[in-house]
A protein has these predicted regions:
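Sec-dependent N-terminal signal peptides
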Residues: 5-14
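Phosphate-group recognition and catalysis centered on beta-loop-alpha active-site segments
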Residues: 18-248
Length: 248
């Protein structure tokens, strides 16, 4: 118990003097996969081939979710309860998309980990080469260390960062978020950070000039379009996932 108390005191002491004026922002990144200030909106959660073809008639890119299975296949699913006999593979998904190499893809790799990082990387590289999409695909994961293996192979990587609510003043939870993210990025270089749009203030305060990819879950009404249009004005924000039927 004593050891735990000492650790908490030390951490708290180190954090209490921090604010956005005396904390250096992390400034990166020279490589940007997509940078079109007039067309930042991509379609969120497009896990069916028919929907992909329909949305790619108006959207320049789509986001999809994949799980890597021990049978050396990626399955396109948002939930880990998928049935391999009823769920399309990433190979089938890409095979069914019209002019597949003409579009952009944000691949949310749900279960990337130390156990599957080597084999899943080989499989991803194979699919990217086969369909000619390596230069227009983002691979995203919460696992910054395993994702680094993908970055080392010149795959564009986005580190998914969870952040507690932030109103411009750093709470203890925010300080812990900041410390963790900074430490992870110092260990493993990535091309972008991805998070919910609610976290934009935190990201722009402490990760200046970093490429940002945002999703906007919950913003679906007509009035919410103004909020999303405001997100477009940030130069660091490169991609915004939306749940509307058409870009605007």
């Amino acid at each position: 118990m004593l050891k735990k108390i000492i650790v908490i005191v030390v951490v708290t002491f180190g954090f209490t003097s921090c604010n956005k004026d005396d904390l250096d922002s992390i400034q990166l990144f020279e490589k940007t996969l997509y940078d079109n200030s007039e067309n930042k909106l991509w379609k969120h959660r497009v896990n069916e081939i028919d929907n992909a073809n329909r949305y790619l008639e108006s959207f320049i890119g789509v986001e999809l979710d994949v799980f890597y299975n021990t049978n050396d296949r990626f399955y396109v699913s948002h939930d880990d309860t998928y049935d391999i006999n009823q769920t399309i593979t990433f190979n089938e998904y890409l095979s069914g998309i019209n002019n597949v190499s003409d579009h952009y893809y944000w691949v949310d790799f749900k279960n990337l980990n130390e156990t599957n990082e080597v084999n899943s990387l080989k499989k991803m590289l194979h699919l990217m080469d086969r369909f000619g999409i390596k230069k227009n695909t983002i691979v995203e994961s919460t696992n910054h260390t395993s994702l680094k293996k993908f970055n080392d192979e010149d795959i564009y990587t986005s580190y998914w960062v969870p952040i507690h609510s932030y109103n411009g003043v750093l709470s203890m939870e925010n300080l812990q978020d900041l410390e963790e993210i900074r430490q992870n990025l110092s260990e493993c270089e990535h091309n972008a950070l991805s998070s919910h749009s609610n976290n934009l203030l935190f990201l722009t305060d402490y990760f200046k000039d970093y490429n940002l990819h945002l999703w906007t879950n919950g913003l679906i009404g007509q009035d919410d379009k103004e909020t999303i249009n405001n997100l477009k004005t940030y130069s660091d924000v490169k991609v915004i996932l939306i749940d509307y039927e058409e870009p605007f």
